Amino acid sequence: KVRKDFEEAGIEDLTQKDVEEHSPFHWVLEFATVYASGGFDIIIGNPPWDVVAPNREDYFTKFDELFRTRGPSDKDETQERLLEDPEIAEGWEHYQNKMETRAAYFNGSSQYKLQDPDIDGSSVGNENDLSMLFLERAFEVASDESYVAQILPGTVFVGAAGKDLRNH
């Protein structure tokens, strides 16, 4: 089922191993009894306020613990030096591809329909903001009579990309 979701989102060349590497969480399987009764009665959360995109600080900090504290030019030099190691370079490319696949999934999945509202005839994307993705998922897994409480960034409430989420 999860692999089919990736294919539906336009990502067709993934193997089962590739899908497993993304560690998908299958809500219906994990909470079958909750789904059978209509969804969760209450959802409380503080979702991440990041975007689904490659982040060199996340990756290169594994090889240089001071990477996050370095200035921009020092980060560039350190990254260049680290990428001289073929294993690190291959891992960086793999990490970037993995993040691009995740972004493509969220952009193409029918499960996330509230992420690119139409404003004055133009589609406004949100760069796969995790807080907005989590909020849309909360709408899906909540029962009709449930309470949802989330700590969210202001862009959800005032940004153009949050329009469909607010109207939902």
Where are these predicted regions, by residue range?
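SAM-dependent methyltransferase catalytic-core segment centered on the flexible catalytic loop
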Residues: 2-168
